[in-house]
């Protein structure tokens, strides 16, 4: 199980195939996505990679966080996430994960924060039908109607679908196909829509319900902290780490 990456949503566009068909794609940009630390079975009880992306000023950063980035010898990151990985998929601390970590044609799962809609009624939020247009109904055409209670149980149960705040939820979209990658600009183009607004942070990782392509780099494609060309970490080196 390989690590994922943290990207920012740039927006949507389309690309054309050789047959002339157009494919709607979402552009995701990797903002210097680097490995910050390891979570090991012996110390933490599970195996994971801590990954950071983006840039952040240290003026208002807590001292503990500054020390964490200093220990990893990387610039402070705006967004930090953990990705569960297998023991043979641990990447070196400080390594920068490249866009060709994912290969064209493979499927990925993306997770983001949905667009906020503010306070919404039952018809918009839950697709309720509303009340009748005539036959005595006035003013309340878009209300939700009865919430289902009477003397027994004498209350409205929790989690009842009602008007309220809509959006700003953690949403995962499964099985989006990678259409193109651009290593120089750090871009990943995936087919279809991705949750969230432009500039939102997106977690991208290998699809859980699809097989990993045979040509996908293992344990990953990355650039070393000293500026060496992108490379794949040897499995033997990772086992001894």
Curated annotation (Swiss-Prot):
Keywords: Methylation, Ribonucleoprotein, Ribosomal protein, RNA-binding, rRNA-binding
Protein modification: Methylated, on either Lys-155 or Lys-158. Methylated by PrmB.
Stretches with biased composition (Low complexity): 229-241
Positions of the UniProt region annotated as Disordered: 139-166, 214-241
GO biological process, one term: translation
Signal peptide segment: none
SUPFAM superfamilies documented for this protein: Translation proteins
Cellular-component GO terms for this entry: cytosolic large ribosomal subunit
Keyword Ribonucleoprotein: yes
Residues the record lists as N5-methylglutamine modifications: 151
Pfam family, one: Ribosomal_L3
PROSITE patterns the UniProt entry points to: RIBOSOMAL_L3
Any one GO molecular function term: rRNA binding
Role: One of the primary rRNA binding proteins, it binds directly near the 3'-end of the 23S rRNA, where it nucleates assembly of the 50S subunit.
Assembly notes: Part of the 50S ribosomal subunit. Forms a cluster with proteins L14 and L19.
Family membership: Belongs to the universal ribosomal protein uL3 family.
NCBIfam families per UniProt: L3_bact
Protein name: Large ribosomal subunit protein uL3
Gene name for this UniProt entry: rplC
């Amino acid at each position: 199980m390989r690590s994922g990456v943290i990207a920012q949503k740039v927006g949507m566009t389309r690309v054309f195939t050789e047959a002339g068909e157009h494919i709607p794609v979402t552009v995701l940009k990797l903002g210097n996505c680097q490995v910050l630390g390891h979570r090991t079975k012996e110390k933490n009880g599970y195996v994971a990679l801590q990954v950071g992306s983006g840039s952040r000023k240290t003026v208002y950063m807590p001292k503990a966080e500054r020390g964490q980035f200093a220990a990893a010898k990387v610039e402070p990151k705006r967004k930090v996430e953990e990705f569960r990985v297998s023991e043979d998929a641990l990447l070196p601390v400080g390594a920068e994960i490249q866009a060709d970590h994912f290969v064209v044609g493979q499927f990925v799962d993306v997770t983001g924060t949905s667009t906020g809609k503010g306070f919404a009624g039952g018809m918009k939020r839950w697709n309720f039908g509303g009340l009748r247009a005539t036959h005595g109904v006035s003013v309340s055409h878009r209300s939700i109607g009865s919430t289902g209670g009477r003397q027994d149980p004498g209350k409205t149960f929790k989690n009842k679908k009602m008007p309220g705040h809509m959006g700003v939820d953690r949403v995962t979209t499964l099985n989006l196909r990678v259409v193109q990658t651009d290593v120089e600009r750090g871009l990943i183009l995936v087919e279809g829509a991705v949750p969230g607004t432009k500039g939102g942070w997106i977690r991208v990782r290998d699809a859980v319900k699809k097989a990993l392509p045979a040509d996908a780099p293992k344990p990953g494609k990355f650039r070393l902290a000293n500026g060496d060309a992108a490379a794949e970490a040897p499995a033997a080196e990772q086992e001894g780490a």
